Amino acid sequence: LFSISSLRNKIIAVVGVLVFLGLLIQSGTNLWIGKRHALDELGQQTRALARSHSESIATWIAARQSVVRSFSSAADASDPVPMLAQAKIAGGVDTAYIGFPDKRIFFSDKQDLPAGYDPTARPWYQMAATTSGVALTAPYVDAASKKLVITFANAIKDGSSLKAVAGLDVFMDGIVSN
């Protein structure tokens, strides 16, 4: 019926096909497992990096909040400029200042403000005056430099009476470069 050589060829062909299918299945499984492992590893590294950046940002914000809270005694100083200059250095910020309800304002550095500048009309002042704790503004255009800036502002109170609002400005271009 079947010659040995023909049966032998059929067995070799069947075994060859089975070996090929086994290798194909094994390769596909290895590829799928490798891809899944690589994606899992990438996800873990991405989450770790995001967590690290989040912690760094939280630490950076907390440091500036601490600095803006720390110079509340500047509200009682006859010349608050030296305290403001020190706060600017300590906070690593672009400008430190303190605004009073009578519309006086003192800065760590000389500012080129528009005529009639009223700190009490500024969003940072109003936000801090109505917030317990340190207020952090959304980016806005700074009145003196015309650059985008964020402000950390803290109301300085005597009981329930507002004495002043202390602020720290950080220019957005500095934040972006870091």
Regions found by a protein language model. Give the residues of each.
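PAS-family sensory domains
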Residues: 141-143
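Conserved beta-strands of PAS-like sensory domains
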Residues: 145-178
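Extracytoplasmic/periplasmic sensory segments of membrane signal-transduction proteins
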Residues: 44-139, 175
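Extreme N-terminal signal-anchor transmembrane helix of membrane signaling/transducer proteins, especially
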Residues: 2-36
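Short, flexible active-site loop motifs that bind/organize anionic cofactors or intermediates
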Residues: 2, 58, 165
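An N-terminal domain-start capping segment
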Residues: 12-17, 52-54, 148, 153-154
